[in-house]
Swiss-Prot record:
Quaternary structure note: Heterodimer of a small subunit (PriS) and a large subunit (PriL).
Name of the molecule in the record: DNA primase large subunit PriL
UniProt-annotated binding residues for [4Fe-4S] cluster: C230, C339, C350, C356
A molecular function (GO) term: 4 iron, 4 sulfur cluster binding
Family the UniProt entry places it in: Belongs to the eukaryotic-type primase large subunit family.
Length: 393
């Protein structure tokens, strides 16, 4: 298996029915120890040989065991460890393969067969040999937007790639596909067997050995500059018809989880499981919700004064205007709606930016932005053993 996101891999997965069926089958195909051994490739490349030639189904089971585990901690050093180990493994397989077929890799490539006669000698002189593959220029730029095109031969809207170039582009696609898949599994993580939490525990141990610290995103002061576009739009105030969804459903759930419990261990968590003082809600979260409600046209609480009780209900305190912390659990603390639901119920709020393509929920958008910001700051600080090592391949 050259790429777990390829068409060939998708055909194998279809034999199990749905992705949920495959995930439930994984504990019967592989064990926790061999899955954890796989991520150790990141620090010991000698382990590669034990994984290069394994059977396709077993390979997919090990890989999806890691993705399922990451759904409980989608952004952190665990993600970087899984990326690094699997990029090393799959790129080595691609490197050893004599010829790459389009169905074996998650890039829309073709065999390079068309070269203008006048360019042949120049191509061989500049690149050493004729490029073997082509990819459409638009896809290339989407994956590697900052790449210098002058270093590639481009003809008829296609970028010509040698195998080493192909691997570079593939790595970018692979990283994006991992994030997308983890975000997809994030939505169903409460349905996964306990096996995946065991795997996550093992990944965390290896990550701490490899990077020397924990990279988990924790609760803290809100960063509005890192909020997703839909939340920023809701904070500006919305017209009648969108008010209840934008304020009570989206903002209430997003702001509360983002501030109190950005990476909840489960969906049925209660506010009192995460904080000891209700003033975090009354002094930090509720004012933001009320300000956004007052910016609506007309202001939400002017014609719906009881909607404040509904906000507390969505926070898990029951239908009340004056709750105490111990009331937490009287109703469900609503989780932020996913992107599909926002698009369906309030399409005006959905104005995607470049980060949105990686996520499926506004909360994971925020987690991702927080993590990337932390990684950038750590890199600036010259953290030799920590974040800088994450980026080494």
């Amino acid at each position: 298996m050259l790429d777990p996101f390829s068409e060939k891999a998708k055909e194998l997965l279809k034999e199990f029915g749905s992705i949920n069926d495959f995930l439930n089958s994984i504990p019967r195909i592989v064990d926790v120890e061999e899955v954890i051994e796989r991520v150790k490739i990141a620090s010991d490349r000698k382990l590669l040989e034990g994984f290069v030639d394994i059977e396709d189904i077993k390979d997919l089971a090990q890989f999806y065991a890691l993705l399922g585990a990451l759904s409980y901690s989608p952004y952190g050093l665990e993600l970087e460890l899984v990326k690094k180990a699997n990029i090393l493994l799959y790129s080595e397989r691609i490197r050893r393969e004599k010829e790459i077929r389009p169905e074996e890799i998650s890039l829309r490539i073709n065999k390079a067969i068309e070269f203008p006669i006048d360019d042949l000698k120049k191509i061989e002189r500049v690149f050493g040999k004729l490029p073997e593959y082509t990819i459409h220029l638009a896809e290339f730029l989407d994956l590697i937007p900052g790449e210098r095109l002058s270093e590639y031969y481009i003809y008829n809207g296609n970028v010509y790639l040698r195998k080493e170039d192909l691997i570079k582009v593939w790595m970018k696609a692979f990283e994006r596909n991992i994030e997308k898949s983890v975000n997809m599994l994030y939505e169903i993580r409460d349905e996964l067997p306990g096996f995946f939490r065991e795997v996550l525990g093992g990944i965390k141990e290896v990550a701490e050995q490899e990077f020397g610290k924990s990279g988990e995103v924790k609760a803290g002061t809100l960063r509005p500059d890192l909020f997703p576009p839909c939340v920023k739009n809701a904070l500006k105030g919305v017209p009648q018809g969108l008010r209840n969804y934008a304020i009570t459903v989206l903002l209430t759930s997003f702001l509360s989880y983002a501030r109190i419990c950005p990476n909840p261990p489960r969906r049925n968590v209660r506010v009192k499981d995460c904080i000891d003082d209700i003033r975090i809600i009354t002094d930090e979260i509720l004012p933001l919700i009320i300000e956004a409600a007052n910016r609506c046209s007309p202001p939400l609480f002017e014609d719906q004064p009881n909607e404040i009780k509904n906000i507390w209900y969505h926070l898990g305190f029951g239908y009340t205007a004056n709750p105490k912390l111990e009331d937490s659990g009287n109703s469900t603390w609503y989780f932020p709606p996913n992107c599909d639901k926002i698009r369906a119920n309030a399409p005006q709020l959905c104005t995607p930016d470049k980060h949105c393509k990686y996520v499926r929920n506004p909360l994971t958008y925020y987690l991702r932005r927080l993590y990337l910001e932390g990684r950038k700051n750590a890199s600036k600080g010259g953290n030799e053993r920590g974040e800088k090592r994450v980026l080494q391949q």
